[in-house]
From Swiss-Prot:
It is found in: Plastid, Chloroplast. The keyword Disulfide bond does not apply. This is Maturase K. It comes from Pinus patula (Mexican weeping pine). Usually encoded in the trnK tRNA gene intron. Probably assists in splicing its own and other chloroplast group II introns. Disulfide bonds: none annotated. The gene is matK. GO terms for molecular function: RNA binding.
Length: 515
């Protein structure tokens, strides 16, 4: 792969015009063979790997020839052979071909995405969930409306192939891709008869399709948004009681005047801001209601024009931050006016002004969380804890670990909110539900369970909580404001409760538009 990248850097035209001969390079299939064995070795016995999974390059080349045929004689996604040995060998060669196809397509895509990102000076972003929180603190208070959009995850295979043709000139190299996509579309497992680009299965091929599809959507959308918002306004800004992130420092510009030691700090404030996590992008807009309606209409037309997709109106929702709450990612978000005293000195302290700034206020969605806990049988609809009967067959350690994992996930995820009083109600529900589950298992009472376990209930998460507050209210942090937020860095993904709540909200919006 390093050799392919070096060739692409020297001559990108060669990469775009001569990709097809790479399919007949034996080194490519050796790489895909090793990668497939590394992935599957954890789930299959070693004796199967040594006896039946020997790679034959002659068989691979014959397999490539079968892919080019119109009758689709090779089955890549569904194995219908009743013989388990032949079924495993067919799956082995099919996965090798898919790995090789992905490797070939990744070479020009990685080079193109690298140079496209380097050329976008003002669209650089951190590719992590941790960058969402400083983005919300910086950009949302300077906006008055947001667009909550969802990326369409179903697309026709021919449209997907045509998007590849925009940056790959080697048409023969796309024939195997077209055959693979159509075969997946016509497979019995795919009932929608379309390509689902969301990677529901963790394979390299589907992950590549999703990354390419999102990159293609955003690259075209960013170029159009830049043209529409070419006039940028400069407003004075300050960051009181905020951590200096690298992203924030980059947005500061210093204008120096001749024969003067003074400097004016100004904040670049574009009118349109974009953030995405998963398949849910959010566009924050500062402008009149007409501008918001135009942006919403443009997003709907954009998908129809470039990807020939009919988007339902509920997939692009607009609302004002001052009147409604938004959700991203799994939070209720609102913007409130918070009077903060900021001293502004100008021209040798001749003028002092007090500025009023907007502040983002993440709210813990207590009522939806209680509703989801009731759905999962941790409590009733009113929030009264009940025993989790389906877990009574587990061991005591497994029950404690599962409850502890749920609480630790919720506490870490919502620790950046100002108002965390509702979290202690959730902790009470989970702790009492855990005690009732153990009491139901041992046919005892809650008092006996608490007396026997004592501090063992949520021991791991409570220790994390104590470390969190000891760090926050230490002697060094005592001088800081008690309303300073600390975002935990333990977040690796959105918690399942937030995903479930988001699905419920989507169904409500869909039913509202259907009426």
């Amino acid at each position: 792969m390093d050799e392919f990248h070096r060739c692409g850097k020297e001559d990108s035209f060669w990469q775009q015009c001569f990709l097809y001969p790479l399919f007949f390079q034996e080194d490519l299939y050796a790489i895909s063979h090793d990668h497939y064995l590394d992935v599957s070795s954890s789930s299959r016995p070693m004796e199967h790997l040594s006896s039946n999974d020997q790679l034959s390059f002659l068989t691979v080349k014959r397999l490539i020839g079968q892919i080019r045929q119109q009758n689709h004689s090779i089955v890549l996604f569904v194995n219908c052979d009743p013989n388990p040995l032949a079924d495993r060998k067919k799956s082995f060669y099919s996965e090798s071909v898919l790995e090789a196809l992905t490797l070939v397509l990744e070479v020009p895509f990685s080079i193109w995405s690298k140079y496209s990102v380097e050329g976008m000076n003002e669209s650089k972003s951190f590719r992590s969930i941790h960058s969402i929180f400083p983005f919300l603190e910086d950009k949302f208070p300077h906006s008055n409306s947001i667009l909550d959009a969802r990326i369409p995850y179903s697309i026709h295979p021919e449209i997907l192939v045509r998007t590849f043709r925009r940056w790959i000139r080697d048409a023969p190299s796309l024939h195997p891709l077209r055959s693979v996509l159509y075969e997946y579309r016509n497979s019995p497992d795919n009932l929608q008869r379309s390509i689902i680009v969301v990677p529901r299965v963790n394979t390299r091929f589907f992950l590549f399709l999703w990354n390419y599809y999102v990159c293609e959507c955003e690259s075209i959308l960013f170029s159009r948004l830049k043209r529409s918002s070419h006039s940028r306004s400069l407003t004075h800004g300050s960051f009181p009681q905020r951590t200096h992130f690298h992203r924030k420092i980059k947005h500061i510009i210093i204008f120096s005047r001749r024969n003067s030691l003074k400097s004016i700090w100004s904040l670049k404030d574009p009118k349109i801001h974009y953030v995405r996590y998963g398949e849910r992008p959010i566009i924050a807009i500062k402008g009149a209601h007409l501008l918001v309606k135009k942006c919403r209409y443009y997003l709907l037309i954009f998908r129809q024009f470039y990807f020939h997709l009919w988007s339902e109106p509920y997939r692009v929702c607009s609302h004002q931050l001052s009147k409604n709450c938004s959700s991203s990612p799994g939070y209720f978000l609102r913007v409130r006016m918070n009077p903060i005293l900021v001293r502004t000195k100008m021209l040798d302290e001749l003028f002092i002004a007090d500025l009023i700034t907007d502040e983002i206020d993440p709210i813990v969605p207590i009522v939806p969380i209680i509703g989801l806990l009731a759905t999962e049988k941790f409590c009733d609809i009113s929030g009264r804890p009940i025993s989790k009967l389906s877990w009574t067959s587990l061991t005591d350690d497994d029950i404690l670990d599962r409850f502890d994992q749920i609480w630790r996930n919720l506490f870490h995820y919502y620790s950046g909110s100002f108002d965390r009083d509702g979290l202690y109600r959730i902790k009470y529900i989970l702790s009492l539900s855990c005690a009732k589950t153990l009491a139901c298992k041992h046919k005892s009472t809650i008092r006996v369970v608490r007396k026997e376990l004592g501090p063992e209930l949520f021991k791991k998460s409570f220790s994390k909580e104590r470390e969190f507050y000891s760090l926050r209210f230490s002697s060094k942090a005592a001088a800081r404001s008690q309303r300073e937020r600390i975002w935990h860095s333990d977040i690796s993904q959105i918690n399942p409760l937030a995903n479930s709540w988001q699905k419920i909200q989507d169904l409500k919006i869909e039913n509202l538009f259907d009426q």
